[in-house]
Amino acid sequence: RGIEYRREPVEYLDVMFDGKPLPAMFSKAPGDGPKPCILHFDGLDLMKEIIYAAVADEFRRRGISLLIVDHPGVGGALRLHNITSGPDPERPAAACIDYLETRADVDPNRIGIMALSLGGYYAPRAAAFEKRLKCCVAWGAIFDYGVAAADRLTGKGGEPSVPAYAEHLHWVFGTKTQDELL
């Protein structure tokens, strides 16, 4: 609601992925013509509205549009559509790029990806397999989530970021046992 009250230039939309909607926000860079665009994926316990509040103005000031997506395992994709995270973040990234390529206000030759925390693993993997991505920013990457999750579950990894951490991980990844999760 705060975005509505501030009258910010954002468009709420769904990007279709495997026949299901990934909730997203598109923040258009000012000016005419196609602009570069960053696709933003979240971490384990974030959602698009938090990222929008943190970075959208900075991208707009630099003439870069931003597509922030609740990708599989995150935010509305998980809570509203039960889309769990999989081992192949390049697939939802490809769906997002397919969508961006339909927009006249996006330069299809200047699409990049950025993500933080667990998303810092997703973004490089997506960029490695999805050749249409021209840049990649891994913001606080977790390169082996199995080790990080095991440490947190056994109390060695610091405080969990969400209550009922083990249950949250099972929900995000669609697993039932710790062996499946790790």
PLM regions: where:
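N-terminal cap/lid segment of alpha/beta-hydrolase-fold proteins
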Residues: 2-36
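Active-site glycine-rich loops that stabilize anionic/oxyanionic intermediates
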Residues: 35, 40-47
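The serine-hydrolase catalytic nucleophile loop
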Residues: 44-57, 71
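Conserved alpha/beta-hydrolase
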Residues: 59-76
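Residue in the alpha/beta-hydrolase core beta-strand immediately N-terminal to the catalytic nucleophile
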Residues: 70, 110-112, 135-137
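Alpha/beta-hydrolase active-site loop
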Residues: 83-109, 125
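Gly/Ala-rich beta-loop-alpha elbow adjacent to hydrolase catalytic centers
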Residues: 115-119, 123
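Hydrolase active-site cap/lid region
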Residues: 128-182
